[in-house]
């Protein structure tokens, strides 16, 4: 069994919808909802929602790259978001819901940039890919009630996933490309 562990950090709008797709993959050790990229130390959900802290809702993934490589994480990430929307994601608007790939080292940056370029050239989207690739910043875990929300609140999670427009967007852009 591999002992390797790395971190990947992705902002993709509401973090509730960003946990389940990664949580279900082999080689994923942990998926944690939280906040990153801002200037406030240990912000609360209420503070982040004001769009004054500079933080984005994000997930930090601990993974074994020998089982589930970073390139596969990137592919899965792109399939959870609208990478052409710079104002938030689906029904959630504002800075805290903008997308971003937070890289932890140079190799991740190279892979993220190559993946973004490949997606831009794929023709899947009519508009340019605007998701930023940023240096990893301090990551602050969200409050416990946000962690693994899809397991704790299944009905509300499903209603939100569909009602926000995310589920339909994913279906229309990726259903025949996976």
UniProtKB/Swiss-Prot annotation:
Q: Which reaction does it catalyse?
A: L-methionyl-[protein] + [thioredoxin]-disulfide + H2O = L-methionyl-(S)-S-oxide-[protein] + [thioredoxin]-dithiol; [thioredoxin]-disulfide + L-methionine + H2O = L-methionine (S)-S-oxide + [thioredoxin]-dithiol
Active site, UniProt feature: 14
What residue ranges are annotated as transmembrane? none
Q: What is the similarity comment for this entry?
A: Belongs to the MsrA Met sulfoxide reductase family.
Summarizing the function annotation, the protein's role is:
Has an important function as a repair enzyme for proteins that have been inactivated by oxidation. Catalyzes the reversible oxidation-reduction of methionine sulfoxide in proteins to methionine.
User: What protein does this entry describe?
Assistant: Peptide methionine sulfoxide reductase MsrA
Q: Quote one Gene Ontology molecular function term.
A: peptide-methionine (S)-S-oxide reductase activity
Question: What's any GO biological process attached to this entry?
Answer: protein modification process
- Broadest EC class assigned to this enzyme: oxidoreductase
Q: Read off the HAMAP family from this record.
A: MsrA (MF_01401)
Name the keywords, alphabetized: Oxidoreductase
Which Gene3D superfamilies does the protein's record reference? Peptide methionine sulphoxide reductase MsrA
Q: What is the lineage of its organism?
A: Bacteria, Bacillati, Bacillota, Bacilli, Bacillales
EC assignment: 1.8.4.11
Query: What Pfam families does this protein map onto?
Result: PMSR (PF01625)
């Amino acid at each position: 069994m591999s002992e390797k562990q790395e971190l990947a950090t992705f902002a993709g709008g509401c973090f509730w919808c960003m946990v389940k797709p990664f949580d279900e993959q082999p080689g994923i050790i942990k998926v944690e909802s939280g906040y990153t990229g801002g200037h406030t130390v240990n912000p609360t959900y209420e503070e982040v929602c004001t769009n004054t802290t500079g933080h984005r809702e994000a997930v930090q993934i601990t993974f074994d790259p020998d089982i589930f490589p970073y390139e596969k994480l990137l592919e899965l990430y792109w399939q959870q978001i609208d990478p052409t929307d710079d104002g938030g994601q689906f029904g959630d608007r504002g800075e805290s819901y903008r997308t971003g790939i937070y890289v932890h080292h140079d190799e991740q940056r190279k892979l993220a940039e190559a993946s973004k370029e490949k997606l831009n050239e794929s023709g899947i989207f009519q508009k340019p890919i605007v998701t930023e690739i940023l240096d990893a910043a301090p990551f602050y875990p969200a409050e416990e009630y946000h962690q693994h929300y899809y397991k704790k609140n299944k009905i509300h999670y499903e209603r939100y996933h569909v009602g926000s427009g995310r589920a339909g967007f994913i279906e229309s852009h990726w259903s025949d490309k996976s």
